[in-house]
């Protein structure tokens, strides 16, 4: 059972990227990149995906066409989608090592963009003790409410914090608090009237199939096979 959440934009500049490089490349980047908008692609046809996934099919795996009305905003986990070459930079606003104040830093650009759907992904760089969760939620909520005031017609989705591998959690105990933080995120979304996207169910095989060597950052195929199809399905079915 999927739960809704959400979003971002990244300016794009000429850069030679090896899509297989993964986290090692992303870690070298300190800021996101933005590109001038290109002509709007033709709308994608909504068709059923194979029964084993339950996702709507993204026609011809054309993620740019599928996400033409969706903007994703977040940290390095979202920047990876651009760095891997899955989505163009104009659909993403992301940077390495940021937290929810990244929304405020890009506030004017996001408001000017006026996306139909906005997906927000923050928390991996902020997560700490359970006692620190309230401060994280308070800051995040304030940033979202500020956006809602200027973007009343934008549907906002908030991502859950991605789980990490058992090995990564054993090295950094704070990651054991991810479920608690996600509970707080779900409560926040319900309180302020935005969608919550809970990806926990997608990580059943994440340990062996989807992690980079650090056990924290997903590989390219996670975004192509799981994350983006799930986001697309949740948004299309909920519109």
At which residue positions do the language-model features occur?
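Alpha/beta-hydrolase-fold catalytic nucleophile elbow
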Residues: 121, 159-160
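N-terminal secretory targeting modules
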Residues: 1-67, 83, 238-239
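Conserved SGNH/GDSL esterase-like catalytic core that processes O-acyl groups on lipids
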Residues: 57-139
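Second-shell loop/turn segments in exported
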Residues: 95-97, 125-134, 147, 170-175, ...
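Charged helix-capping and loop-helix junction motifs
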Residues: 133-143, 174-182
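A short helix->loop->beta-strand "cap" motif at the edges of active sites that frequently abuts
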Residues: 151-155
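Catalytic His-Asp segment of secreted/periplasmic serine-dependent ester chemistry enzymes
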Residues: 3, 164-239
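Extracellular glycan-modifying ectodomains
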Residues: 1-28, 80, 113, 125-126, ...
């Amino acid at each position: 059972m999927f739960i809704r959440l959400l979003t971002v934009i990244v300016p794009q500049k000429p850069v030679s990227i090896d899509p297989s490089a993964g986290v090692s490349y992303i870690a070298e980047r300190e800021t996101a990149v933005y590109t001038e908008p290109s002509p709007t692609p033709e709308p994608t046809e909504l068709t059923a995906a194979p029964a084993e996934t339950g996702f709507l099919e993204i026609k011809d795996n054309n993620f740019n066409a599928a996400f033409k009305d969706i903007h994703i905003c977040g940290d390095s986990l979202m920047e990876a989608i651009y760095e891997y070459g899955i989505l163009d930079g104009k659909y993403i606003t992301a940077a390495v090592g940021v937290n929810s104040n990244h929304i405020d830093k890009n506030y004017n650009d996001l408001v000017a963009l006026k996306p139909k759907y906005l997906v927000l992904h923050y928390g991996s760089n902020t997560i700490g003790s359970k006692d620190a969760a309230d401060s994280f939620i308070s800051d995040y909520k304030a940033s979202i409410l500020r956006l809602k005031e200027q973007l009343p017609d934008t549907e906002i989705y908030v991502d859950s914090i991605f789980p990490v591998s058992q090995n990564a959690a054993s090295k950094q105990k704070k990651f054991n608090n991810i479920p608690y933080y996600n509970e707080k995120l779900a409560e926040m979304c319900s309180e302020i009237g935005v969608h919550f996207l809970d990806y926990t169910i997608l990580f059943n095989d994440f340990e062996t199939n989807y992690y980079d060597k650090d056990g924290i950052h997903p590989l390219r195929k996670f975004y192509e096979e799981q994350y983006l199809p799930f986001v697309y399905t949740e948004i299309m079915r909920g519109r």
